[in-house]
A protein has these predicted regions:
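Flexible hinge/capping segments at coil-to-helix
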Residues: 151-167
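An extracytoplasmic/periplasmic, membrane-proximal ligand-sensing/linker region
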Residues: 195-197, 299-334
Length: 334
């Protein structure tokens, strides 16, 4: 071995087979690269295939979902990377993200809080082909009143009455382009027919409702007396009642809508085995009972309760989703 500072060996001292070895190495290099690419295809990004993690996009309220997910992790050792969404645009924003990621899925499990967007995603091929999604428990769309300002007997018996002059400037609702409010209005279109529905939407908007950022805000408006009545979700009414707010839900009618939670596994989920475990866990009766106990859900037997409200033809609702949504934009986003 040459000492430090010594002249480098001359070319005549280079090993005679140097070029041959170099040529062989260059020949092997493309095959090594191909092998690496194949391995990356089989196990992309290494840690993403960990058996101890699952990514879930969640539209259920974070305050209700987190204890359930913590219980799942404690039982299985699988960490849940949870992505939640905002009150104002939840479900729609998550749905758009899942649609955008179809070619390179980042999510394993979708925990939805209403049915329409889940059906839309299923129709768009976002979920796996078999055992793709299921409904889990239910809550409902309700009218909420301020009990200090009106009695149940004084409350309207139909949503059609909300366009009467007596309710001018007295009704609160969330933006009807997102979440359960959009689903409810689109289901009403399916029941009433397009002409009656469009006329009602226009008359309702002309009656100066408070259109606010989310169903919990609807209940707050009613609780504070800023509105006498609101169109919202049963779990938001329950949350306000726990805090002592003077609000009450009107009984279910033929115009009410039962809204199940949904659970789905994404097609080509990065973590299929943990995804299946979470999918099964969220369907357990005891998990549903926990959500009912905190009034995030009203019950677990959707089939037995479905007769209490609207029963939309979901295929027709999906078929008309885009034009009907455009009508809602034109009416409520002036």
């Amino acid at each position: 071995m040459p000492t430090e500072g010594a002249d480098p060996p001359s070319k005549s001292h280079q090993p005679k087979d140097w070029f041959a070895r170099s040529e062989a190495q260059q020949t092997r290099l493309p095959w090594l690269l191909i092998a690496c690419v194949v391995l990356l295809e089989i196990v992309p990004f290494g840690c993403h295939r960990s058996a101890n993690v699952v990514t879930a996009y969640i539209a259920q309220d974070q305050v209700y979902a987190e204890p359930i997910l913590a219980q799942f992790t404690k039982e299985t050792g699988i960490k849940v990377r949870a992505v939640f969404d905002s009150e104002a645009v939840k479900t729609v924003a998550i749905a758009n993200r899942l649609l955008a990621e179809r070619g390179h899925p980042q999510c394993d499990v979708f925990w939805g809080n209403e049915e329409l967007r889940t059906r839309q995603l299923a129709a768009e091929g976002v979920f796996r082909e078999t055992n793709a999604w299921t409904a889990v428990g239910f809550r409902s769309r309700r009218l909420v009143i301020n009990t200090n300002r009106m009695s149940l007997a004084e409350a309207p018996k139909s949503l059609l009455e909300l366009t009467n002059a007596s309710w001018r400037g007295q009704v609160a609702m969330a933006y009807p382009l997102f979440g359960t409010t959009a689903t409810h209005l689109l289901a009403l279109r399916n029941r009433w027919g397009d002409a009656v529905w469009v006329a009602w939407c226009r008359a309702l908007q002309a009656n100066r409702p408070f259109v606010v950022d989310g169903n919990s805000v609807v209940v707050q408006f009613v609780a504070r007396g800023q509105a006498r009545i609101g169109l919202t979700d049963s779990d938001d009414i329950a949350a306000a009642q726990r805090e002592g707010a003077p609000v009450a839900a009107l009984p279910l009618t033929a115009e009410s809508l039962l809204i199940p939670n949904t659970v789905a596994v994404v097609r080509r989920a990065p973590h299929p085995e943990p995804a299946q475990k979470l999918y099964e866990f969220l369907q357990r009766p005891e998990v549903v009972e926990q959500l009912v106990a905190v009034r995030a859900l009203e019950g677990g037997g959707l089939a037995q309760s479905a007769a209490a409200g609207l029963q939309p033809d979901w295929s027709a609702v999906l078929r008309d989703l885009n034009p009907a949504t455009e009508i809602l934009k034109q009416i409520f986003l002036k």
